Amino acid sequence: MFTVRPAFSDVTFEGANNEIVILTGDIEAEEFDEILAEIKAKKPTQMILDSEGGNGHSARRLAKYVNDNNISTYISGVAKCRSACAIIFLAGKKRLCEGVLGIHQASLPKDIGNEEVNMNYALKYIQEDIGNLIELLNDFNTPSFVYPYMLKTTEMYNFSQEEIAQINTVKSLDEM
């Protein structure tokens, strides 16, 4: 078993061949490259998620890797996957949520999210960022009903069980 910090609060590999990676806690930019390198080296086939979110750009990088490498994503019945974590979950070609899945609209990063930022720059940044996110989510075959919640919800929106059933691509862990 291998644990790395702090890009996620906890990253653990399990299984005889490290086929399962468990990611819990906040998604941070610090040391993210090392964690992504470790995931690439161990080549897990399933990712278990439990995170309230964090750095969206780090999440997108991991999500792209998850999708490109056919890693299944899973949220257990006692887990939550919100905000940036949801992007990673949606990247799974085989994905199953039995817990809480939540999203909200994008916000400016801390380094440009202050009052002194030129409004035109901020608008351009947000539009480009949202465009890139939609393109990525389309690559993940994300159901279109997800987008209005992503664009209009200022606070966290937790999907209903009926909506999660439409987002899931498998019905049980046996199919993963």
Sequence positions of predicted segments:
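Bacterial N-terminal signal peptides
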Residues: 1-3
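STAS-typified acidic loop motif
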Residues: 7-34
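Terminal peptide-recognition signature
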Residues: 23, 47, 89, 164
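Sec/Tat-exported extracytoplasmic proteins
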Residues: 31, 39-43, 51, 66-70, ...
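Extracytoplasmic/secreted envelope proteins and their assembly/folding machinery
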Residues: 32-36, 59-63, 67, 85-86, ...
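Short, glycine-/small-residue-enriched flexible loop/hinge segments at domain edges that mediate gating
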Residues: 44-58, 72-79
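Glycine-rich beta-to-alpha active-site loop
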Residues: 67, 71-112
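Charged, glycine-interspersed solvent-exposed loop segments at helix/strand-loop junctions
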Residues: 109-176
